UniProtKB/Swiss-Prot annotation:
Pathway: Porphyrin-containing compound metabolism; protoporphyrin-IX biosynthesis; protoporphyrinogen-IX from coproporphyrinogen-III (O2 route): step 1/1
Protein name per UniProt: Oxygen-dependent coproporphyrinogen-III oxidase
Record: residues binding a divalent metal cation: 96, 106, 145, 175
Database matches in PROSITE patterns: COPROGEN_OXIDASE
Cellular localization per UniProt: Cytoplasm
Cofactor(s) recorded in Swiss-Prot or TrEMBL: a divalent metal cation
An MF annotation (GO) of this entry: metal ion binding
Gene designation: hemF
Top-rank taxon, per record: Bacteria
Region of interest: Important for dimerization: 240-275
Record-stated family: Belongs to the aerobic coproporphyrinogen-III oxidase family.
PANTHER family, alphabetized: COPROPORPHYRINOGEN III OXIDASE, MITOCHONDRIAL, OXYGEN-DEPENDENT COPROPORPHYRINOGEN-III OXIDASE, MITOCHONDRIAL
EC primary class: oxidoreductase
Amino acid sequence: MKPDAHHVKQFLLRLQDDICQTLSAVDGANFVEDSWRREAGGGGRSRVLRNGGIFEQAGVNFSHVHGDAMPASATAHRPELAGRSFEAMGVSLVVHPHNPYIPTSHANVRFFIAEKPGADPVWWFGGGFDLTPYYGFEEDAVHWHRTARDLCQPFGDDVYPRYKKWCDDYFFLKHRNEQRGIGGLFFDDLNTPDFDHCFAFMQAVGNGYTEAYLPIVERRKAMVWGERERNFQLYRRGRYVEFNLVWDRGTLFGLQTGGRTESILMSMPPLVRWEYDWQPEAGSPEAALSEFIQVRDWI
């Protein structure tokens, strides 16, 4: 089947609706929608839930941008895209909970297609999801990765280990020499064996996010926390900010190509703190995190 951008867009719009409805049902608060248009072509729907019962901030963004030509920064490494019209669409989300015992989660699924008359379209899918705990619980990590493995299984035995490794490699803070969290799945440039297969996998990843995350939220939401745990959560959120602003390709591409800044930075935590050369107390739960987020096989 030839690539069908309209079909992908309809799925992404439904996915945004489904995820927002699911998170609202768990939290009790509602998302506020901010629809926006891009002068050069396209637009999107940014939805944010603030100060809910469970989530301090959750942002779920849909965007669909298009144009007659790719920006030079995008074609420098992909000369085959020069002179083609393009469409790029996706859903991206980040959830920052109040409770430090609930991890932060991130997910993204996206589709890109570039076309010109008389030539085959250039297209691919990308996406994934990853988990950033502040306090490590092995059963949560096992559930997260088992859900990822199970959704990958119908697409081949090698899919989960390959995209798990890609996720571990991608969400790494080189300047800190540490992982951002415990990973999950990450894939990009997916266009084989055919459109239907790739689209089905992207849908499985998008639909699998809430199955992976919500049981962890339910398991941890009643745990009691205080100032110590909150301060550690805010400190570790600093790593999240550092990764997004220094290393994340999507954030950098969006800011460098005139994307909508409010939507791009929607992933940022609402509160964060840095402390010079802070070290956790030896033997404390906070000190245990650095070992917990080391790359390993969870299942």
